[in-house]
């Protein structure tokens, strides 16, 4: 049983329909990721504001007696809210991978751009295909 090589279709309208379907599907995938990314961005903004407010509270504190108690006691007694924020941030970034979830549509678009470039195609950040002019190699 011989393996046949895959060829481009002879009919240009079939290739055009395939490109339209690919563009539609890519746009759907990137659009579907949008609301999830927005929710994670809002969570990160709330977390950053919370850390900023709590951190500024301790920077504004002018007490020098911080160095007179052990670090563990300081973080578990006087800075408990900052310690909790630190562990929530660690949970968000290390366990849930929020940073990857936020930039997921950008990663998908960039990888599609890389895969489409040999075919003189590209795509924008929304998944719309862009046809680039074909590169002509001039023989010397």
Swiss-Prot record:
The lineage of its organism: Eukaryota, Metazoa, Ecdysozoa, Nematoda, Chromadorea. GO terms for cellular component: cytoplasm; Nem1-Spo7 phosphatase complex; nuclear membrane. Disruption phenotype: RNAi-mediated knockdown results in the formation of two nuclei in each daughter cell following the first embryonic division. This is Nuclear envelope phosphatase-regulatory subunit 1 homolog. One of its GO terms (molecular function) is protein phosphatase regulator activity. GO terms for biological process: lipid metabolic process; positive regulation of triglyceride biosynthetic process; regulation of nuclear division. It is found in: Nucleus membrane; Cytoplasm. PANTHER family: NUCLEAR ENVELOPE PHOSPHATASE-REGULATORY SUBUNIT 1. Keywords: Cytoplasm, Lipid metabolism, Membrane, Nucleus, Transmembrane, Transmembrane helix. The chain crosses the membrane at residues 42-62, 78-98. It holds the Pfam family Tmemb_18A. Disulfide bonds: none annotated. May form with the serine/threonine protein phosphatase scpl-2 an active complex dephosphorylating and activating lipin-like phosphatases. Lipins are phosphatidate phosphatases that catalyze the conversion of phosphatidic acid to diacylglycerol and control the metabolism of fatty acids at different levels. May play a role in nuclear membrane dynamics being crucial for early development of the embryo. InterPro entries: NEP1-R1 (IPR019168). It comes from the Eukaryota.
